[in-house]
Swiss-Prot record:
Mg(2+) 1 binds at residues 652, 727-728. GO terms for molecular function: aspartic-type endopeptidase activity; DNA binding; DNA-directed DNA polymerase activity; dUTP diphosphatase activity; exoribonuclease H activity; RNA stem-loop binding; RNA-directed DNA polymerase activity; RNA-DNA hybrid ribonuclease activity. This is Gag-Pol polyprotein. Belongs to the retroviral Pol polyprotein family. Its cofactor is Mg(2+). Mg(2+) 3 binds at residues 1291, 1343, 1379. A zinc finger (CCHC-type) spans 385-402, 404-421. Residues 1270-1430 form the Integrase catalytic domain. GO terms for biological process: DNA integration; DNA recombination; establishment of integrated proviral latency; nucleotide metabolic process; proteolysis; symbiont entry into host cell; viral genome integration into host DNA; viral translational frameshifting. InterPro entries: Aspartic_peptidase_AS, DNA/RNA_pol_sf, dUTPase-like, dUTPase-like_sf, dUTPase_trimeric, Gag_p24_C, Integrase-like_N, Integrase_C_dom_sf_retrovir. The active site is at 464 (protease). SUPFAM superfamilies: Acid proteases, DNA-binding domain of retroviral integrase, DNA/RNA polymerases, dUTPase-like, N-terminal Zn binding domain of HIV integrase, Retrovirus capsid dimerization domain-like, Retrovirus capsid protein, N-terminal core domain, Retrovirus zinc finger-like domains. It comes from Maedi visna virus (strain 1514 / clone LV1-1KS1).
Length: 1506
């Protein structure tokens, strides 16, 4: 074996030094190290496994290749231990080859694992460089300066692998250690000066040591200047240090001497500081002793610092820093209490003043009293202490002379936990209380210390559930280093070292956990990060003293809870869920459900980026069935509404939801199921004991609970500013620092009594403080992310654009800039991956917002000063700013332009929003500053354009562009245009008649309102600068008077009209109420109502009065061969009157030349293109040039005669003989009836009535149909319902897996059905709108389903004017009609489904069958009955309106407000809501009379008789 070993040693000569270094690495906690045999065994085994790599030299690249391959192998069960040993040994060899010195095998494995990702990148880069520069030396990663083959040099950055390796060495051995010096000297051989200094600055280490190193470098530089006077060939200090040089310049050959000098200076500085640190007089070694006073310690420290050969700035830094860090724990705590967050910057004199009493006998007694004080009573000191036994202040419960009292039975002598009469608590009601939900852990009187093995050492750690991290003062360097970590707590910000994968052992439980090494920590703490893994929990004793209020929750009436089966999950997800649920059960947050709790909600899980599983619960169905609670908090608090405070503290409540118990009777509805893989065992069912995540009432219950808990405490502390939103608490005060922190600690103790914990690492003391996305500073506030990302021109997806705009909108309270162009870019395709194109205008708009965000800072509210809100017109938006002092805004905002509102109305809307914001945030009414002049706003208010003004307002010179008031309701000098438009004789027409005699009319499609507006538009186009417009449309009249800005109008016709009007000098608009009795309006009404001869196109000419016809124009040059006929389409469409027809005739000039028009009859209703058929009777070709008159159109009167029957008495030779007189005509209809039945499957009665065949024949057709025989209707449900015209019933039914919403009209039996996605209230309300739009119902009956009885549904029914009633619960007779309809519908649907491809088509066919093809006893279908009822209602309404149409009255007119004599009687020409129109017989004028000056009388008797 010895020979074999020596032979193997010769086989790896290149690894001789590496193996020697590897043998110094310890295998475990003891002194046992790896042997040379272990290394050779590993190398030999690797060569045997990977024969393709056997011949390659053992470089670091080969080792990483082997490492990656080993990771991909899966060893057999019996070889796992050897395989792990092989991996560990290889990791040690790799570390030794890279020059690293891990202490243990475990540390080596951690280092290699950490470098895997970086190594892959390095290999890829290395291959590329080797191809370009084959002359590189072996360890090319240490050469940032690369020699080119073509001459010269180039620079490349320091490799990340090298930088990481240097960081690791500095962290493990120290910044000034020999190991770090040796590594830096090796790698920095060809680094530039700038690279050396930058790498040194970024290394982890003591700040004092870095300051000393910098001082030594400055001394070297001063020495160089003294010894080397300036000259042409002498290097300057800047050249040596690389100041003012680019990387390329510094890499050239002429700078080699400068780089070597800089490298030597750095090495000298490292050695000097290292020797200084080991010298007895080193100030960093001067530390305060426990029995030493602070003054004596400072004297020794200052003496040591003054003796150091360093500059004065470094001495000052050492004095300020070491006077705190090297002080004793007692002095540090005293300085923290007195100096607060500025303790690190305080002078030595201030620290001596703070610690003047530390070490005295009185101070020692005070510390002893604090140490003996029971835990959890920090908030009750001195006279504020209160006995929870008798309720009196001044002593504690254990000191009470009245004896302990039981809080269950009220008797003295025993505690509640020992009470024999105590019974099991029942279900809590509203207002009842219970303790915080916790796991069944052992309860102790004070936080205990337990023995934990950390790495290789046993330590006593304090169990602290308020600490998130596990903190130790020293560590054996086992595990994986993860760099520095910042810890924040009451004492300020502290920096420690983070280590992962550290061996932790508590009793028999062993885990791999994370720790933080903090040498200055006064106590070593076991945090919550490792407590749960080790199975340790802690409950403070005083947490049992107060109970959490319970909020009652329940399901909606008639609901039974969710019963949704758990869907299948993969094995991986089941394992992740099991781990989570087991932990929740152990902590007491979930429990095992009893068998009779049948509700179920599905669960699933997702994997987070950290690799851990997160449990999700699908509470959608439970949320639907649960009654809502009011929101206790309606929005986020805003920092602009906070008052400026001297001290602030931000607290975070840990596990907020999981601390509050769920109302016990409700817990049965929260059950969920853990499946068993492959059904190997029964499923395990759980229920929630606490507020679960994802349940809709968790936020409300939490808010109400915290409100009840904190109400009394807040009232007792009026001197503080208190804010809470969910689990974030804000506390601000102007008290002293110690008093402020005392109140914070008191609050922490107070809510801890209810079981709520405040994690120490999430507590923020002092400014800057981060709260709800804001960053609070002493005099201002801003957003945490205070920059917006840049955007560039080019394509961008809608999803990314929405995220950018969302970031901007969140920050609008500091930006206050509108982005109309970017918002318009978001319109169009709503697909998230659809692309938009960013242009320069969008970039400029975005950059303006980014710049504004950089410049703007928010201020705090001062309750002693008034608040002002200033509004102005921005870029298509209203921008406003809220302030108390000019230039110091509390916040700003933007209200984007609202369509169909004038500028003044938009500013008032924004003022309302501003006022509401100020009242909510500060409780004060602001003084509003409006842009423009005061008289303009008063005029707007008087005209009725705005109906609200702020309580306190004034004006300033703003940028609002007031429109000139050129649209008035008075007569202006100029022509008058009477306009009208609408549906006349079934066609849309519009036009105007001017007082100048000008007339215009045209056919056009559109609604009545659109045609009215189009008539006004045409009049505005043709009218002069000054004109009047008269319309009978109140809608159009009021629109014009509002004088809207055309930029904010949605209606395009209205926008065009306002643009034309604003370009006029002055325009008067007038309204007349009707056409009757007003000559001009009657004239325009008749004018556009006439069916006029209208043409479209240029293929016809106007004719003279004496001409017989209209000439038609040839559209283009036409060639007609001899004897041929050609059809020519001309540019003409014509609309004839009802009593006209037309013919196309030949012109005499063409007939003389042998060219004739053939046919050419145009019917009265024809509206298509006119075509002319031409025949060339010549024996040669004829050419008709373009534009030639070649035919004529002649109008003729239309004569219509009715065709009379033949007549029964007429004598003919045939007489009554022949087929057809036998009476058997119905036989021909049987095939038609069979064909129709095969399509729609009607019943026999419908076939009998529709085709006139005998009833027996129709029944034979139905009986011979196989489909109908297989799908016979079931027996009819019996029951009675309310029936009536326009009264409907509605209900859901299910066909296979599809849901159908069915409506049936109770009078006619008409059915309307739609397939829906689900039985939700939102879906039902959408379908209700469709149903109402088609049938205009009056009343509806439904059952008591959640969708039908929801509050939103009731509000919709009330809005539509539908009387909605519900049937009797659980009584099917109350819904008998719609239930019967369900059976009929599904029976017919089953017959028709095979005939259609889509289910929706089959459903529509079913409605045709039941509504149209199904005939009743009188031969009418449900559709016939429904239409007949609607027509009867219309006729009755019309008859009633005609009876009320003709009215008579007496009236009187007023002069200067005084009523005149009564006149009349006269006929009412038009009546409105508040006035009528009559014609004055004396003056022949039309008068508008208010109803108060009218007395209506019955019509004359002769009219009544008629």
């Amino acid at each position: 074996m010895a020979k074999q070993g020596s032979k193997e040693k010769k086989g790896y000569p290149e690894l001789k030094e590496v193996i020697k270094a590897t043998c110094k690495i310890r295998v475990g906690p003891g002194k046992e190290t790896l042997t040379e045999g272990n290394c050779l065994w590993a190398l030999k085994t690797i060569d045997f496994i990977f024969e393709d790599l056997k011949t390659e030299p053992w470089t670091i690249t080969k080792m990483y290749t082997v490492w990656d391959r080993l990771k991909g192998l899966t060893p057999e069960e019996t070889s796992k231990r050897e395989f792990a040993s092989l991996q560990a040994t290889l990791a040690c060899i790799m570390c030794s080859q890279m020059g690293m010195k891990p202490e243990t095998v475990q540390a080596a494995k951690g280092i290699i694992s950490m470098k895997e990702g970086l190594q892959e990148n390095k290999e890829a880069k290395g291959e590329k460089v080797e191809q370009l520069y084959p002359n590189l030396e072996k360890h090319r990663e240490v050469y940032p300066i690369v020699n080119l083959q073509a001459g010269g040099r180039s620079w490349k950055a320091v490799e990340s692998v090298v930088f990481q390796q240097l960081q690791t060495v500095a962290m493990q051995h120290g910044l000034v250690s020999e190991d770090f010096e040796r590594q830096l000297a090796y790698y920095a051989t060809t680094w530039t000066s700038k690279d050396i200094l930058e790498v040194l600055a970024m290394m982890p280490g003591n700040r004092a040591q870095k300051e000393l190193i910098q001082g030594k470098l400055n001394e070297e530089a001063e020495r160089w200047v003294r010894q080397n006077p300036p000259g042409p060939n002498v290097l300057t200090v800047d050249q040596i240090m690389g100041v003012g040089q680019t990387n390329q310049q510094a890499s050239q050959a002429n700078m080699d001497q400068a780089r070597q000098i800089c490298r030597q200076w750095v090495i000298t500085a490292l050695r000097s500081v290292r020797h200084m640190s080991h010298r007895p007089g080193n100030p960093m070694l001067v530390k305060q002793k426990n029995t030493e006073s602070y003054e004596d310690f400072i004297a020794r420290l200052l003496e040591a610092i003054d003796a150091e050969p360093v500059t004065d700035p470094i001495k000052t830094y050492l004095k300020v820093t070491l006077s705190y860090t090297n002080a004793s724990t007692d002095c540090q705590k005293q300085m923290d209490r007195t100096l607060g967050t500025r303790v690190q910057q305080a002078t030595v004199e201030e620290k001596m003043q703070a610690c003047r009493d530390v070490g005295s006998e009185g101070f020692k007694m005070q510390l002893l009293a604090q140490a003996l004080r029971p835990q959890g009573k920090a908030g009750h000191k001195g006279v504020n202490q209160k006995c929870y036994n008798c309720g009196k202040p001044g002593h504690l419960a254990r000191q009470c002379r009245q004896g302990i009292i039981c809080h269950h039975c009220g008797k003295r002598g025993h505690m509640q936990k020992d009470c024999r009469q105590k019974k099991q608590q029942g279900k809590q009601q509203e207002g009842a209380t219970c303790g915080a939900v916790r796991a069944p852990y052992v309860v102790t009187e004070a936080p205990p210390k337990i023995e934990i093995k950390v790495g290789t050492r046993w330590k006593k750690l304090l169990v602290d559930t308020g600490a998130d991290k596990t903190i130790v003062t020293s560590h054996d360097m086992s595990g994986i280093p993860k760099g520095r970590i910042i810890l924040q707590g009451i004492g300020g910000i502290i920096e420690g070292e983070k280590w992962e994968q550290v061996h932790l052992q508590y009793k028999d439980k062993i885990i791999r956990g994370t720790i933080v090494v903090l040498a200055t920590s006064p106590v070593e703490v076991l945090g919550r990060d490792n407590m749960s893994e080790l199975g340790i929990g802690l409950i403070m004793a005083n947490l049992e003293e107060k109970k959490i209020p319970i909020t009652e929750v329940r399901l909606k009436e008639g609901c039974k809870g969710p019963h949704i089966a758990q869907w299948p999950l993969t094995q991986e997800k089941l394992e992740g869920l099991k781990e989570i649920v087991d932990r929740l059960e152990k902590e007491g947050k979930v429990g095992r459900a009893p068998p009779h709790w049948t509700c179920n909600t599905p669960i699933f899980c997702i994997k987070k980026k950290s690799g851990k599983w997160r449990m999700l619960i699908d509470f959608r169905e439970l949320n639907k069935q649960t009654e809502d609670l009011a929101e206790a908090q309606l929005g986020l608090p805003h920092p602009g509404g906070l008052q400026r405070k001297k001290h602030v503290t931000i607290l975070d409540i840990g596990d907020a939801y999981f601390t509050i118990p769920l109302y016990e009777p409700y817990r049965q509805y929260t059950c969920f199921t853990m499946l068993s893989p492959n059904n190997l065992g029964p499923c395990v069912r759980y229920y929630w004991k606490v507020l679960p995540q994802g349940w809709k009432l968790s936020p409300s219950v939490y808010q109400f609970t915290m409100q009840k808990i904190l109400r009394g405490w807040i009232e007792e502390h009026p001197m503080i500013q208190f804010g809470i939103y969910m689990d974030d608490i804000y506390i601000g005060s102007d008290l002293g620092l110690e008093e402020h922190r005392g109140i914070v600690n008191e609050l922490a103790s107070y809510i801890a009594q209810y079981g709520f914990m405040l994690p120490e690492d999430k507590r923020q003391e002092g400014y800057p403080a981060k709260w709800l996305g804001f960053e609070l500073h002493p005099e201002k506030w801003k957003f945490q992310k205070h920059t917006l990302p840049e955007i560039t021109e080019g394509p961008i997806t809608l999803n990314k654009l929405q995220k950018l705009v969302g970031d901007l909108v969140w920050r609008q309270s500091l930006i206050g800039k509108s982005i109309p162009n970017i918002l318009k870019l978001m319109e169009g395709d709503r697909a998230l991956q659809s692309e938009r194109y960013i242009e320069s205008i969008h970039v400029r708009e975005w950059e303006a917002c980014r710049q504004k965000l950089k410049e703007m800072e928010g201020n705090y509210y001062d309750e002693e000063k008034d608040i002002y809100g200033q509004l102005d017109w921005g870029n298509k938006a209203i921008e406003y700013i809220v302030f108390q002092e000019k230039g110091k805004p509390l916040w700003v905002n933007v209200v984007h332009s609202i369509k169909n509102l004038s500028q003044a109305q938009q500013i008032i809307k924004a003022a309302q929003k501003l006022t509401q914001e100020v009242i909510i945030r500060t409780g004060k009414i602001p003084w509003i500053l409006l842009p423009g002049r005061e008289e303009d706003w008063i005029l707007e208010l008087q005209m009725g354009n705005i109906n609200w003004m702020p309580s306190f307002w004034s004006c300033y010179k703003g940028s609002v562009r007031w429109k000139k008031r050129n649209v008035i309701a008075e007569v202006v000098s100029g022509p008058t245009y009477y306009t009208d438009g609408g549906k006349k004789n079934g066609r849309g027409s519009l036009g105007y008649i001017a007082s100048t005699g000008e007339k215009f009319r045209i056919y056009e499609e559109g609604t009545n309102q659109q045609l009215e507006l189009r008539a006004i538009e045409e009049a505005c186009k043709q009218g002069p600068e000054k004109m009047n417009i008269v319309t009978d449309s109140r809608y159009a009249y009021e629109f014009m008077l509002r004088n809207w800005d055309e930029e904010v109008i949605r209606n395009p016709i209205q926008a065009r009209i306002m643009e034309l009007m604003h370009n006029k000098e002055k325009i008067g608009v007038h309204w007349v109420p009707g056409h009757k009795g007003i000559p001009q309006n009657e004239e325009i009404d008749r004018y556009i109502s006439e069916i006029f001869l209208a043409k479209e196109g240029r293929g016809i000419l106007q004719k003279r009065a004496e001409d017989a016809g209209y000439d038609l124009i040839c559209p283009q040059e036409i060639s007609i061969p001899a004897g041929q006929v050609k059809r020519i389409a001309i540019d003409l469409k014509i609309n004839l009157k009802k009593d006209q027809w037309a013919m196309i005739g030949t012109k005499s000039s063409f007939a003389n030349k042998g060219v004739f028009v053939q046919g050419g009859i145009i019917d009265s209703g024809y509206q298509g293109t006119i075509q002319v058929v031409i025949y060339n009777s010549n024996n040669k070709e004829v050419v008709i040039p373009q534009g030639r008159k070649f035919a004529q159109l002649i109008l003729m009167p239309l004569i219509h005669e009715e065709l009379e029957p033949w007549g029964e008495t007429r004598k003919t030779e045939r007489g009554e003989q022949g087929f057809g007189s036998t009476g058997m005509y119905w036989i021909e209809n049987i095939p038609l009836a069979e064909e129709e039945h095969n399509k729609w499957h009607q019943d026999a009665v419908s076939l009998h009535l529709e085709f006139g065949i005998p009833r027996t024949a129709a029944e034979d057709i139905v009986q011979q149909c196989d489909v109908c025989q297989e799908n016979k209707m079931p027996s009819t449900l019996r029951g009675s319902n309310k029936r009536g015209i326009d009264h409907w019933q509605v209900d859901y039914t299910h066909y296979e897996d599809k849901i159908i919403l069915v409506w049936v009209e109770t009078n006619s039996g008409l059915i309307y059905a739609e397939r829906v996605k689900g039985e939700t209230g939102q879906e039902f309300r959408v379908q209700t709108m469709k149903w109402y739009a088609m049938f205009a119902p009056k009343s509806l009956q439904s059952d008591n389903g959640p969708a039908f009885v929801a509050e939103s549904t009731q509000l919709l029914m009330k809005y539509l004017g539908i009387e909605h009633t519900t049937g009797i619960p659980w009584n099917p007779q109350s819904q008998a009609l719609v239930e019967r309809t369900h059976q009929t519908l599904k029976n017919t649907l089953e017959k028709l489904i095979p005939m259609f491809n889509a289910f929706e088509s089959a459903l529509a066919g079913t409605l045709i069958t039941l509504n149209i093809k199904r005939k009743g006893g009188l031969g009418t279908s449900p559709m016939d009955i429904f239409i007949f009822n609607k027509e009867q209602q219309r006729i009755q309404q019309q008859s009633k309106s005609k009876q009320e149409k003709i009215r008579f009255c007496y009236y009187r007119t007023r002069k200067r407000g005084h009523p005149g004599e009564w006149q009349g009687p006269t006929q009412v020409l038009w009546g409105g809501d508040g006035a009528i129109v009559v014609k004055d017989r004396g003056t022949d004028r039309y008068l508008v009379i208010a109803n108060k000056d009218v007395k209506f009388i019955p019509p004359p008797k002769e009219i009544q008789k008629e």
